[in-house]
C-alpha cells in the first residue's frame, strides 16, 4: 500500500496495485486540483504516511485478496500480458502461479501487483488517523468523499474504464479451473471461486494473512472468494 497525500486538507488515500488504483488516483487528483488529470501514474503516487497522521482523515481502498490475485493473474499473465515474459514454464495454470507466489522470491511473479496490500509503504500507524474509512473497490462511498471535499466528482471520472477490466463474454464456466492452462478458459466468464480448491484457498489465505486480519479489523470480511 502507498498513499496519496493532500497535506493542505489533511486527507489521504491508501491504494494498492490491482485494487482500482487508476480509478482512485483519478478521483484524488481531481479532488486535490479541481481538474481532471490525464497523468495519473508517477513518483508522486508512492508516498509514506505523514508524520502527523493523527490529523488526517484516511480513506483506504481495498480488495478481497482472493479476487485480487485472480484479477492480476488474468490481466498481467495472459498471453499478451505485461508480465507474461517473466513466466518461465511452458504452460501457466493458477495453481502453479500460486505455488510460485508463495515461494516469495518474486522471480516469475511481479512483486508490486501481487505483494500483500499490507506491505510496501503500509504502516500500522495508519490506525492513529483522526478518522479512517476502508472501502472495498466494489462498494466505495463516493458521497462521503464528495462531502469531504465539498465538490461533485464528474461522471466522466466515475465511469471511466481504464483498460484492465475483464470483458463480459458470451459463455461462462462454473467448474474448477485452477489446474487448467489459462487459454482454456480465458475467453469465458469465470467466477473467482472457480479458481480455488481447499488447498489453494489455504495457501492464498496464509500468504495474505495480514491483509485478512487488517481489513477484518476495519469491518471487511474477505474470508471467502467472490461469488
Show the residue positions of the predicted features.
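Membrane-interface amphipathic segments in extracytoplasmic regions
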Residues: 1-227
Amino acid at each position: 500500500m502507498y498513499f496519496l497525500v493532500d497535506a493542505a486538507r489533511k486527507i489521504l488515500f491508501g491504494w494498492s496495485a490491482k485494487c482500482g488504483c487508476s480509478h482512485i488516483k483519478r478521483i484524488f487528483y481531481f479532488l486535490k486540483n479541481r481538474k481532471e488529470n490525464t497523468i495519473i501514474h508517477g513518483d508522486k503516487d508512492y508516498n509514506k504516511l505523514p508524520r502527523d497522521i493523527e490529523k488526517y482523515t484516511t480513506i483506504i481502498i481495498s480488495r478481497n485478496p482472493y479476487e485480487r490475485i485472480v484479477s492480476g493473474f488474468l490481466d498481467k499473465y495472459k498471453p499478451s500480458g505485461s508480465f507474461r515474459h517473466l513466466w518461465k514454464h511452458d504452460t501457466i495454470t493458477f495453481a502453479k502461479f500460486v505455488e510460485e507466489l508463495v515461494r516469495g522470491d518474486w522471480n516469475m511473479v511481479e512483486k508490486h501487483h501481487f505483494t500483500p496490500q499490507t506491505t510496501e509503504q503500509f504502516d500500522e500507524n495508519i490506525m492513529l488517523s483522526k478518522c479512517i474509512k476502508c472501502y472495498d473497490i466494489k462498494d466505495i462511498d463516493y458521497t462521503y468523499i464528495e462531502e469531504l471535499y465539498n465538490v461533485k466528482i464528474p461522471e466522466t471520472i466515475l465511469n471511466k474504464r481504464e483498460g484492465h477490466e475483464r470483458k463480459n463474454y458470451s459463455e461462462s464456466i462454473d467448474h474448477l479451473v485452477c489446474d487448467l492452462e489459462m487459454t482454456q478458459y480465458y475467453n469465458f466468464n469465470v467466477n473467482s471461486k472457480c479458481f480455488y480448491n481447499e488447498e489453494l484457498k489455504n495457501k492464498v489465505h496464509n500468504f495474505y494473512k495480514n491483509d485478512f486480519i487488517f481489513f477484518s479489523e476495519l469491518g471487511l470480511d474477505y474470508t471467502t472468494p467472490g461469488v
